[in-house]
Every structure is written in C-alpha cells, then in structure tokens.
Amino acid sequence: DRDSAINKMRSALAQTQIAGIETNLDYLRQVFADTSFNAGTVSTQFLSTFHYQPQTIDVLAPGAFTMIQDYPGRLGYWNVGVPPSGAMDALAFRYANRLLDNPESAAGLELTVTGATLRFNVETVICLTGAPMQATLDGVSVQFWTTVSVKAGAVLQMGAIQGNGTRSY
C-alpha cells in the first residue's frame, strides 16, 4: 500500500549516506516529507511546482585559498603520502565550533589571506574566528568571535586580513 511504501522509502533515504559532492538525497527527502505528496493529492505536474530548499551555500568568489578543514585533520596516512592537514589555527577553528554548539570535529571553511564571497540558501548561524578580516553580511560589518544569524539569500563578503595572521575561519 502507498503509506507503507512511502514509510519504507523515507527510512531508506534517512539511512542512505553518500560522501563527496552534492547529491539529490536532500531533494528526495523533502519530496517525501511534503504533505501533499504524502496525502496522494498530487499529479504528474507536482515536481514542476515543488519548492526545493537546498541546505547549501553558493560560492560567488572563492578568495585566495579557501579550503574545507576539520579537526584534528587526516591523521595516520603519512604511509600513503597524505600529510595530517587540518586547520592551521586549530584553536580558533575549534573555538568557532564551540560557539556554534558544533562537535569539535565539525568541518568548516579556512580562508587564507583574502576571503570568499558566499550566498546562503538557507537560514543559519555563522561565526568568524582567527585572523581579523574585513567581513560584511549584506553590507553590514560582521564581528569576529561571536555568533551571527544569517537569513536565506544573505551574502557574506570577506576581504583581506587586517593585521597579524593569515588564516580565518
């Protein structure tokens, strides 16, 4: 029956994990969570009008050397030529995760010398730490070392580092 099939598919989608680039898993999860879809009141035109809200950030400009890092990095792979990596300023990186109530090991962006320009597709909370860098959110200055609420569609623009240091998070 339809309800049983939908529940099985929801369960399968919840348990599916694919590492790497963006997939359509989140899209499918949102379709299967839609009340009209679950009620069976949709037609074949449903997907053409379905509003998908991606949980993503668009990189409008990458900055000089922006990378995704985590803590403590990739340890134990020197034997196959992979250095430990991880955030250069582990303290600032971990502090940002703590302010955001993230696990210490949660991934984040490391910006080197000059920052990126990012558009947020979903409401979120961010925190900037590390070397002080020019930063504005929709044209308004952003403070470092504190959490900042970000609305969907907002643009975070980060410029050059001001003062000591080369890495911001």
Put a short name on every predicted segment:
Residues 1-56:
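Catalytic cores of soluble metabolic enzymes centered on carboxylation/carboxyl-transfer
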Residues 54-169:
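Conserved "landmark" site that anchors the functional core of diverse proteins
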